[in-house]
């Protein structure tokens, strides 16, 4: 396998299971390597050979559009043989356990497995059973490390830094793996983090993660450099956490009036998929302060960087 990226960064981990456990040097190295791939992806020839001869399996137990397609594009641009396995094609639907699925896949000697699962900790369980490297593409409400990395890259490219910025994360924090990974990363990189949500959508003891807490948008967005909106994850809700979508939007949905509570040059982010008219309106989502489309672009570059960094640790690298 030959590497084509200029950076000599090597991630000191066999897997990427979460932001927790990464050092500031790890995060910075991945962001710097991602910058190289941002430039590559804007060229006509986007191909590199750093994963040539390697097999990448995308194992998605939850439906995904952005993340799965982004990992597929990332692997193919680096020259990997990429296989996608979705919920409908997995033998777990026939009663096979996750451990048996892992052992079956391991017998085929994949080099990199990218996995999404509805259960927190499922990706770590898989990682203990396979010989290749494993990337967490989201596990329950636990972590989504590549989303946090692409968000950090987007912020750094637009604000020039992460240190000292105030990032307001608004919405369904309780069920959000994106919020958790972003909180860990942003705190590590010196940003201030404020979570904004009704009490029913805040995890107990969230303050222990080193965040400020606000329960209304006026207080929550005051002085914010970045406003990061989260959707209501109804698929993870077992009861009624909000009275109605319309009432939720009235109090916590981001529109121009509420955005004015933040700094005049504040930028808006959303990990997707968006529920327009629930947590964000179209004028803001499509407006000049929105970075939402840029986040999607950064996702491919970040996932290329992660795949390459892990591949450099493989025995045949």
From Swiss-Prot:
Binding site for carbamoyl phosphate: 66-67, 116, 144, 147, 272-273
Pfam families listed in its UniProt record: OTCace, OTCace_N
Alphabetical list of InterPro entries matching this protein: Asp/Orn_carbamoyltranf_P-bd, Asp/Orn_carbamoylTrfase, Asp/Orn_carbamoylTrfase_sf, Asp_carbamoyltransf, Asp_carbamoyltransf_Asp/Orn-bd
Binding site for L-aspartate: 94, 177, 231
Keywords in alphabetical order: Pyrimidine biosynthesis, Transferase
Catalytic activity, as annotated: carbamoyl phosphate + L-aspartate = N-carbamoyl-L-aspartate + phosphate + H(+)
The keyword Transferase appears for this protein: yes
EC code(s) of this entry: 2.1.3.2
Pathway info: Pyrimidine metabolism; UMP biosynthesis via de novo pathway; (S)-dihydroorotate from bicarbonate: step 2/3
Gene Ontology process terms (BP): 'de novo' pyrimidine nucleobase biosynthetic process; 'de novo' UMP biosynthetic process; amino acid metabolic process
Top-level lineage group: Bacteria
Gene Ontology cellular component terms for the protein in this record: cytosol
PROSITE patterns per record: CARBAMOYLTRANSFERASE
GO molecular function, one term: amino acid binding
Protein family (similarity comment): Belongs to the aspartate/ornithine carbamoyltransferase superfamily. ATCase family.
Subunit structure: Heterododecamer (2C3:3R2) of six catalytic PyrB chains organized as two trimers (C3), and six regulatory PyrI chains organized as three dimers (R2).
Protein role: Catalyzes the condensation of carbamoyl phosphate and aspartate to form carbamoyl aspartate and inorganic phosphate, the committed step in the de novo pyrimidine nucleotide biosynthesis pathway.
UniProt cross-references to NCBIfam families, sorted A to Z: asp_carb_tr, PRK00856.1
Listed name of the protein: Aspartate carbamoyltransferase catalytic subunit
Species the sequence originates in: Nitrobacter winogradskyi (strain ATCC 25391 / DSM 10237 / CIP 104748 / NCIMB 11846 / Nb-255)
Lineage summary: Bacteria, Pseudomonadati, Pseudomonadota, Alphaproteobacteria, Hyphomicrobiales
């Amino acid at each position: 396998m030959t590497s084509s990226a200029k950076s000599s960064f090597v991630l000191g981990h066999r897997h990427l299971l979460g932001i927790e456990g990464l050092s500031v040097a790890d995060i910075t190295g991945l962001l710097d390597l991602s910058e190289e791939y941002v430039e590559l992806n804007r060229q006509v020839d986007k191909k590199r050979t750093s994963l040539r001869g390697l097999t990448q399996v995308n194992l998605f137990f939850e439906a995904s559009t952005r993340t799965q397609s982004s990992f597929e594009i990332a692997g193919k641009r680096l020259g990997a043989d990429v296989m996608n396995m979705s919920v409908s094609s997995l033998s777990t639907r026939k009663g096979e356990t996750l451990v048996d699925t892992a052992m079956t896949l391991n017998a085929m000697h994949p080099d990199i497995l990218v996995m999404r699962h509805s259960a927190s900790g499922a990706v770590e369980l898989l990682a203990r059973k396979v010989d290749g490297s494993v990337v967490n593409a989201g596990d329950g409400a636990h972590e989504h490390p590549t989303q946090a990395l692409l968000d950090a890259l987007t912020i750094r490219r637009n604000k020039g830094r992460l240190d000292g910025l105030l990032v307001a994360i608004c919405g369904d924090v309780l069920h959000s793996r994106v919020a958790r990974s972003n909180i860990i990363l942003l705190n590590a990189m010196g940003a201030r983090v404020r979570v904004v949500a009704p009490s029913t959508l805040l995890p107990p003891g969230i303050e222990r993660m080193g965040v400020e807490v606000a329960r209304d948008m006026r207080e929550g967005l005051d002085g914010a450099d970045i406003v990061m909106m989260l959707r209501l994850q109804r698929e993870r809700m077992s009861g009624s956490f909000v009275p109605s979508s319309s009432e939720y939007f009235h109090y916590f949905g981001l529109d121009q009036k509420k955005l004015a509570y933040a700094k005049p040059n504040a930028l808006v982010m959303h990990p997707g998929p968006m529920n327009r008219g629930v947590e964000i309106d179209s004028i803001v989502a499509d407006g000049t302060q929105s970075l939402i489309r840029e986040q999607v672009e950064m996702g491919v570059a970040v996932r290329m960087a992660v795949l390459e960094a892990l591949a450099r640790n493989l025995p045949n690298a």
